[in-house]
């Protein structure tokens, strides 16, 4: 399914889009969005070396943590839609802040982003909403985790709660590896098995 003018029928203007992020996800979004005939310019901040190779795209520097500067730049660039790619600004409530400033934003608010940034909250949400999900335990100490590991059978999955840049999930082949994985991430946050 492509992005065409019908995809954006609720927008009175769609000249300038800002995409926040610097990864392949953001470049893919920029590539798809720039194909729409309504879009004149796609700004990426910070973008990456490949961003400017995409038609209609320009990398710009905006400190998204400096809210005053961000709002000023968005107004100056006459941005019609902001797309937030990375999880961290979503988890920190950037989409909520921008919506309160009357900007159109594609990306969940802080509460919606919690499904991504908190593994324990997401699992509890699925359980409470009767959404099928694997059995899980939430532990608060390494000793508690080891006890569950010893009483369980492999395969087990060990997950750090919170954002871990894609590095917080382990699928060990043995209980010993499971304990090592648990030890390696336990100081970062709560772990889930």
What residues fall within each predicted segment?
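ATP-binding N-terminal substructure of ATP-dependent carboxylate-amine bond-forming enzymes
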Residues: 1-111
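Glycine-rich phosphate-binding loop of ATP-grasp-fold ATP-dependent ligases
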Residues: 133-138, 156-185
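Short, glycine/charge-rich beta-strand/loop segments that flank catalytic centers
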Residues: 84-91, 108-117, 137-145, 163-166
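Conserved small/polar residues in nucleotide/adenosyl-binding loops
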Residues: 82, 191-193
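Short acidic-hydrophobic, aromatic-tinged amphipathic segments that line or gate anion-handling sites
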Residues: 59-65, 137-141, 172
């Amino acid at each position: 399914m492509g992005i065409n003018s019908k995809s954006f029928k609720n927008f009175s203007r769609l000249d300038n889009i800002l995409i926040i992020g610097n990864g392949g996800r953001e470049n893919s979004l920029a590539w798809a969005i720039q194909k729409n005939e309504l879009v004149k310019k796609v700004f990426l901040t910070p973008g990456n070396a490949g961003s400017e190779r995409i038609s209609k795209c320009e990398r710009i520097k905006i400190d998204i943590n400096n809210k005053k500067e961000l709002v000023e730049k968005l107004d100056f660039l006459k941005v019609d839609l902001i797309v937030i790619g990375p999880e961290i600004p979503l988890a920190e409530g950037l989409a909520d802040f921008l919506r309160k400033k009357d900007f159109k934003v594609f990306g969940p608010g802080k509460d919606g982003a919690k499904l991504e940034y908190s593994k324990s909250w997401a699992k509890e949400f699925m359980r409470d909403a009767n959404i099928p999900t694997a059995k899980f335990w939430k532990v608060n100490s390494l000793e508690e985790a080891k006890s569950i590991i010893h009483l369980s059978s492999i395969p087990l999955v060990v997950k750090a709660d919170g954002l871990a840049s894609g590095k917080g999930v382990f699928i060990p082949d043995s209980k010993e590896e499971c304990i090592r994985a648990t030890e390696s991430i336990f100081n970062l946050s709560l772990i889930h098995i």
